[in-house]
């Protein structure tokens, strides 16, 4: 049995949205579904103005069943199956965060077959050590996540996305790892990106 205090969750959501939008008016806060997701949580965060960050077809299905607007979803993950990408495009997902050239090709083919233009973001690997546990470090050169800036893959991925007629490159993304207790790795990564 899991018990959540709804008012506390709503207050936290409002605080996150309020803090970000008060400083950056064009901010968009997304709840990381991997933390915990069921239909009630999905509805609650959507009602409070947050989007959802989903990493699987299952999380996407929960969000869809909960009535979360699909344009408020970001689909992350470095191992999306063709079926999950098809489901995402078919569902009208807001953005797919692309992690590999293979995924970009699959997504482009699916969007073309459906006659849609899919918004995408490119996940970059800035090769920054966040000084955390090796198993949770995701933004270094040999990471399995994203396109390396240092090797030129990031520039090639951006060019390929811009050239794909059924993909609309709307942004870039990076993640360094967790937990991170220092600001310096973020500052270095932002300068690198």
Task: Give the ranges of each region predicted by the language model.
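A charged N-terminal "starter" segment
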Residues: 1-119, 155, 159, 164-169, ...
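Short beta-strand segments
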Residues: 32, 119-125, 173-175
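Active-site loop/helix belt of alpha/beta enzymes
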Residues: 127-193
